[in-house]
Amino acid sequence: MSKQMEKSALGKKSSGVVLKEITKIFQQPDTGKDFVAVDHINLNIQDGEMVTLLGPSGCGKTTTLRMISGFEYPTSGSVFIGERDVAKIPPNKRGISMVFQSYALFPHLNIWENVAYGLKVAKVSQDEVVRRTNAVMELMQLTGMERRFPNQLSGGQQQRVALARAVVIEPSVLLFDEPLSNLDAKLRESMRDELRALQKRLGITSLYVTHDQSEAMAISDRVVIMKDGVICQQGTPQEIYEQPASRFVANFIGKANFIDGIFKGRDGEAALVEIGGKTFSIPAPGKMEGVQKDGPCCLAVRPESILLSEEEGPLPGRVSRATYYGAKVEY
C-alpha cells in the first residue's frame, strides 16, 4: 500500500494528550482506607508521538492508561485529548482505540468481521466499511485470512487482527496495555518492531504500557518511568539510560554496578569523586540534586563501561562470576 493510500485510509485524526494534576484514589475494601494509585501526574504527549509508561507492578501505569481511555475516572485533575477535557466523558466518546494484552477478539466472527466491527457500531456506510477494512487488512498483512476465525490464527496473527481493529476506526489516540506479553520472546521482538514501524507510518499518537525495559527502549520516542504513583523521570530512551535521575531509575533500566564515593566538587561538566582514596573525573552534565561537597554519593556504572585487564588499573577488582550468553560474556 502506498503512503498516500495509508494516509487517506487511516490515522488522519491524531491528537496530542495532556494530563494535568491527575490523581486517582481507591478505597481498600478490606480496611476502608484510601490508596493513592496515581498522585498528581502531569504529562504532555505530542501529536504523533509514541510514549511508553514503564515501571514495576503497582506503580500506577495501567491506572493512568485507564484514565486516558475512560475505563477509570480520575479523582481529580484533567485529561485533554486535543482541545477537549475528556476526564468525565465515557470511553466511546473519546475517539480512542485500545489494544489489550488478551487480544479480545470475537470468537464467533471471522477476521474481516472482527476488523470491521467498530465501523459498523459507529454506523459508517457499507461502502466505507468495505474500503477501510480492506485497506487495513492489506496494511496489516492479513489479506487472504478474511474468512478464518481467531482460533485458526497464531498468537502473532491474532495480535495483528487486534491492532487492525484498533486503527481502522481512525482513532485520535492509540493505547496499548502490555499487548505483547502473551507472545514468546522471538515473536514478541518481531511484533515489537512491526508495531513501531506501523505507528511511525500512520503517525497516530500512542501511549504504551509495559514492564519490559527492552521493549520500552526499542519502540519509544519518550519513556516515562513511574514508581508509587508518581513520575520519577521522563526522556528519550538514550537520556533515561545514560542520565538516570535516581538509583531506582539506573537499576530499573538495564543493569548497573553501584559504587559509593565522596563528592569533591565539579569541574565543568564533570564531577570529581573520591573512591578508595583516589579522585576520579566522572562525566555528569546534568543536575546533582541532594549531593553536597565532601558528602557521600553513589556512582552507577554500566557493565559495558567496565574494561577488564590483567594489568594494574585505577581500581582493583576480582572476577567473582562469569555468565555465558552466546554473543557476550557477563562478568
How would you describe each model-predicted region?
Residues 1-25, 33, 311-314:
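ABC-family P-loop ATPase nucleotide-binding domain
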Residues 3, 242, 270-323:
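Glycine/charge-rich catalytic "coupling/switch" loops of P-loop NTPases
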Residues 54-56:
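The feature captures the beta-strand-to-loop junction immediately N-terminal to the Walker
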Residues 69:
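Helix-to-loop junction immediately C-terminal to a conserved catalytic motif
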Residues 77-85:
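Conserved ABC transporter NBD signature motif
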